[in-house]
Amino acid sequence: MALLLTALVAGCAAVDRHPTLNYPDATASDAQAAAPKNKQIILNPFLDHRGDKSNVGTVKSAFGLRTTEVVPANDVSVWVIDGIKTELQNNGYVVTLGSSSKDTLPGASAAVSGVIVDVTCDSGHSGKVAVIGKVRKGNKEVLSKNYSAHGSAGFAMMPTAEACAKSLSIALAASVKRFVAELDGMLTSSN
């Protein structure tokens, strides 16, 4: 009985809480990659402006008490950039990584940068990702918009780091795909 009570209070806090955040791999059901567009995008860093950069969520006990934090095994900023780079390449763009929010190259179609506003996963492992995507053409900012999405790998009775990572991955994919679709529409309509 004491063991059961301890498990309920702890909320299974002994389970690993260090998920590795990955961007979803393309599957056979996804649309085929777009034909090369012969357009270059400079992908600059996304600044991490989350309120608490040390974790991506907390685990609570059955009584709603905070028991432990979910700390990603990898860098959230790199994870976001990898997701955006993947989607840009899947849409046929040539991607060059920049080093500052204003990096541009002569002949580049656009420079992309942004801000990471939120990356959180709750105890039921519903994930939320919010980024502000920015696009510059030449010296002019032509887009600055919030792209936010939720994702869920399903409710987890026994929360795991993998379930949290999968939910966040789903949320990031939804946010990034909307951002890249809007960027793509802007660049293809300006031909």
What are these regions (language model features)?
Residues 1-12:
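Sec-dependent bacterial lipoprotein signal peptides
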Residues 83-91:
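Amphipathic alpha-helical segments
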Residues 12-82, 184-191:
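A structural "domain/chain start" motif
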Residues 59-61, 131, 148-150:
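Short intrinsically disordered coil segments
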